[in-house]
């Protein structure tokens, strides 16, 4: 979110170089040619990748599988819980505040290694207690880095009476990643059930 604003910040402060940004529901932005996500630059990049891999005798599918084999199989999902009315809004706020004030130490067998609070602009290292700023715009979002490349992100929807739980895992195969994703999803929902 707010990718163009982050590009401008990098350009005006001289800190950082923007390469790529994305939003899970609305695409990606490659380079600084535009200030918002568009299909044109994404399509151009995909065509460039297809041409590159064709010269190597590979399809995009082959390249994707090679990346999975090299870096791991990543799977992510989202669970949204609808809570309408004044009571629903209060429950969403309560869940966010409960998580903000009581960072989980473990979810689904994964140890929480760091906790990011974008509303408070903090990243806390759970092992050392060290806190540093996120450096990103303020937003009511909590993000937990877990062991083994897993993660959880929680935020209220900006357009609907829902709270959303995003989560992801890294596996050694597609089957392993799917099993881990299902297990972490069940653990996230069990954690939420305790707060309902």
Region locations from a protein language model:
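Phosphate-binding and adjacent anionic-ligand microenvironments
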Residues: 1-155, 162, 173-178, 185-196
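C-terminal charged capping/lid subdomain of soluble metabolic enzymes
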Residues: 160-168
């Amino acid at each position: 979110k707010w990718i163009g604003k982050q590009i401008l910040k990098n350009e005006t402060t001289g800190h950082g170089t923007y390469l790529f940004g994305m939003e899970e529901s609305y695409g990606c932005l490659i380079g600084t040619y535009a200030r918002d996500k568009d299909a044109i630059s994404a399509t151009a990049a995909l065509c460039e990748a297809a041409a590159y891999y064709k010269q190597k005798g590979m399809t995009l599918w082959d390249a994707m599988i090679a990346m999975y084999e090299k870096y791991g199989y990543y799977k992510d999902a989202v669970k949204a819980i609808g809570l309408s009315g004044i009571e629903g809004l209060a429950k969403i706020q309560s869940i966010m505040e409960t998580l903000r004030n009581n960072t989980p130490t473990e979810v689904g067998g994964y140890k929480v290694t760091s906790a990011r609070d974008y509303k408070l602009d903090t990243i806390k290292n759970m092992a050392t207690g060290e806190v540093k700023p996120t450096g990103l715009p303020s937003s009511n979002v909590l993000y937990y880095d877990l062991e083994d490349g897993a993660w959880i992100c929680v935020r209220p929807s900006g357009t609907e009476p829902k709270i959303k739980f995003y989560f992801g895992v890294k596996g050694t195969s597609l089957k392993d990643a799917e099993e881990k994703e299902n297990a972490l999803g069940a653990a996230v929902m069990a954690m939420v059930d305790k707060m309902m």
